């Protein structure tokens, strides 16, 4: 599993360089991130080529009509809006990448140091990272298969370049969300280690019998020192999370909009297939099935992304609950140990871990449920409008 994870991370780095999202170089031997002229030229060239091809595509015949002879005006409108928002969102994400390049370099180096100091965090997030890479690989592969199959009778070099430009947008989105996912998973792994150590301290503190002896005082001082180190590590970790959220907040807002519209468009597309039948030129049923499987993996990918954040918030809440067990300690413990527990708990109350994005929304299960409810409502309204008017 460790070798598989290392392979996934290397592929992600290569994919990030290929799409220009990672506009700096990482020394694979030392892990140090550096801004170089070569990395800058590669990223700039890739982005200029992608947007030049997209600009050329907007001047050509609608891709929807080319792919599907039954396309109506609603299909044109829906997929035009989705494509437009996707281009704008990707453009804003890349602007954020370039304007904050030094910030992302410092952020990457911070996570590199976090891993070097705590290599055990990988065992708590290895499986989730590999699962994420599997879902992304499947969605992108199925996306390519379905797109090429629909265009197989009209495929040319020019059209292939246009398709590549469109698929590059999806690749850029996946690279960014995967980076955020891996970073969040690493933080979650570090929280798991801190909670494990904190649980041990709480258990030992509960077993203490106050007697004022030298051994008792020494034991309390030893536990207080360990607890102070955990409190310092948690404070540094929460600061890292805040820096991560600040750097990614613009990109995450764009990604949420993109995911929302993609889910809406895909659900409407599946309805249209069931209503109007296969695409033009007697498209094989297997391609329709690939589209359905793609939608399933896309939903699973969204679910994995959401629960990665939920588990991080749960890990923080678990730390708060562990500290609340201090009320069960026997009276008469060492004053310093009690004060360290109190200060740690008060600090978590004053500075709760909350992931805000421009003040627009806060990550959490309630927010995700509201987004899902809104997505379901808008999908049904779109389908209802199609049924009534076409």
UniProtKB/Swiss-Prot annotation:
Transmembrane segments: 39-59, 76-96, 129-149, 157-177, 253-273, 284-304, 367-383
GO biological process terms, semicolon-separated: monoatomic ion transmembrane transport; sensory perception of taste; signal transduction
Pfam families reported in the protein's UniProt record: 7tm_7
InterPro entries linked: 7TM_chemorcpt
Cytoplasmic side: 1-38, 97-128, 178-252, 305-366
Cellular compartments annotated: Cell membrane
Coiled coil region boundaries: none
Topological category with respect to the lipid bilayer: Multi-pass membrane protein
Extracellular topology ranges: 60-75, 150-156, 274-283, 384-390
GO cellular component: axon; dendrite; membrane; neuronal cell body; plasma membrane
Keyword annotations of the record: Cell membrane, Membrane, Receptor, Transducer, Transmembrane, Transmembrane helix
GO MF terms held by the record: ligand-gated monoatomic ion channel activity; taste receptor activity
Tissue: Expressed in the adult labellar chemosensory neurons. In larvae, is expressed in neurons of the terminal external chemosensory organ as well as in the dorsal pharyngeal sense organ.
Biological role stated in the UniProt entry: Probable gustatory receptor which mediates acceptance or avoidance behavior, depending on its substrates.
Family per similarity comment: Belongs to the insect chemoreceptor superfamily. Gustatory receptor (GR) family. Gr22e subfamily.
Protein name per the record: Putative gustatory receptor 59d
């Amino acid at each position: 599993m460790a070798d598989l994870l290392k392979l996934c991370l290397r592929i992600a780095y290569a994919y990030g360089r290929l799409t220009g999202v990672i506009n700096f170089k990482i020394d694979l031997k030392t892990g140090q991130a550096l801004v170089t002229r070569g990395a800058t030229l590669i990223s700039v060239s890739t982005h200029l080529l992608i947007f030049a091809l997209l600009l050329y595509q907007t001047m050509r015949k609608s891709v929807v009509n080319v792919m599907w002879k039954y396309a109506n005006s609603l299909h044109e409108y829906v997929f035009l809006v989705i494509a437009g928002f996707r281009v704008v969102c990707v453009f804003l994400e890349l602007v954020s990448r370039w304007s904050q390049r030094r910030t992302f370099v410092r952020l990457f180096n911070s996570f590199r140091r976090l891993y070097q100091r705590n290599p055990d965090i990988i065992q708590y997030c290895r499986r989730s990272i590999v699962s994420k890479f599997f879902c992304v690989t499947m969605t992108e592969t199925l996306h390519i298969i379905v797109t090429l199959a629909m265009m197989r009778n009209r495929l040319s070099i020019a059209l292939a370049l246009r398709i590549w430009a469109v698929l590059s947008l999806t690749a850029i989105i996946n690279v960014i969300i995967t980076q955020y996912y891996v970073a969040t998973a690493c933080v979650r792994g570090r929280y798991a280690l801190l909670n494990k150590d904190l649980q041990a301290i709480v258990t030992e503190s509960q077993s203490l019998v106050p007697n004022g002896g030298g051994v008792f005082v020494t034991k309390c001082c030893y536990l207080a020192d360990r607890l102070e180190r955990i409190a310092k590590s948690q404070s540094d970790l929460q600061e890292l999370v805040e820096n991560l959220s600040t750097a990614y907040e613009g990109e995450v807002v764009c990604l949420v909009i993109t995911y929302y519209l993609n889910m809406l468009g895909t659900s409407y597309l599946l309805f249209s297939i069931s209503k109007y039948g296969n695409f033009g030129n007697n498209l094989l049923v297997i391609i329709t099935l690939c589209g359905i499987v793609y939608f399933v993996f896309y939903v699973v990918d969204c679910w994995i992304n959401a629960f990665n954040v939920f588990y991080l918030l749960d890990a923080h809440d678990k730390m708060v609950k562990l500290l609340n067990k201090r009320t069960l300690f026997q009276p008469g413990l060492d004053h310093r140990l009690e004060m360290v527990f109190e200060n740690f708990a008060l600090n978590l109350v004053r500075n709760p871990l909350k992931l805000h994005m421009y003040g627009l929304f806060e990550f959490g299960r309630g927010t995700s449920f509201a987004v899902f409810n809104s997505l379901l409502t808008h999908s049904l309204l779109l389908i209802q409008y199609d049924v009534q008017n076409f």
